[in-house]
Amino acid sequence: MLLFSKKIAQHKGGICLEGIVRFGVSMESKLLKQFDELIKKKNYNNRSEAIRDLIRDFIVENQWEAEDVETIGTITYVFNHEVREINDKLTDMQHKHYKNIISTMHVHLDEHNCIEVMIVRGKAKEIVKIADEIISTRGVKHGKLVMTTTGENL
């Protein structure tokens, strides 16, 4: 029996307490043990916080697949600045996509290698296209696109 002094209502799939829905999850005990170990390692206060983050992440990732959703992210790549014309190519790409590139940070890693981190914003399909173009450039040793949400729909 639930005893709350706050407003309680029924919700499809669980009990709703002022905008929060309580529901049950069934899983194997081994999986739950692994989950509990991970949420402790990640410093979550409880399972609910971890599950909310997992659900948000799942929603955000699926929004990218729509391709028309406004998104924000980073393109991080390591490149050898001694590869012929790479600096010019990367700069040209940045100017070509200036409407989507908010900021770029450039760091010298050693005598030969640099890392750049770009903050990008736009439709998911545009961001993926820019990342693919940069990461596939000759001289780029490794690159990664990380997209997230603008937060509007969460």
From Swiss-Prot:
Keyword Metal-binding: yes
InterPro entries: Acetolactate_synth/TF_NikR_C (IPR027271), ACT-like_dom_sf (IPR045865), Arc_rbn_hlx_hlx (IPR013321), CopG (IPR002145), CopG/NikR_regulator (IPR050192), Ni_resp_reg_NikR (IPR022988), Ribbon_hlx_hlx (IPR010985), TF_NikR_Ni-bd_C (IPR014864)
Lineage top rank: taxon: Bacteria
UniProt xrefs under SUPFAM superfamilies: ACT-like, Ribbon-helix-helix
GO BP, one annotated term: response to nickel cation
Names of the cofactor(s): Ni(2+)
Example GO molecular function: nickel cation binding
Function, in words: Transcriptional regulator.
Cofactor binding: number and manner: Binds 1 nickel ion per subunit.
Binding positions for Ni(2+) per the UniProt entry: H95, H106, H108, C114
Pfam families membership: NikR_C, RHH_1
Protein name per its UniProtKB record: Putative nickel-responsive regulator
Stated family: Belongs to the transcriptional regulatory CopG/NikR family.
Record key words, sorted: DNA-binding, Metal-binding, Nickel, Transcription, Transcription regulation
CDD domains: RHH_NikR_HicB-like
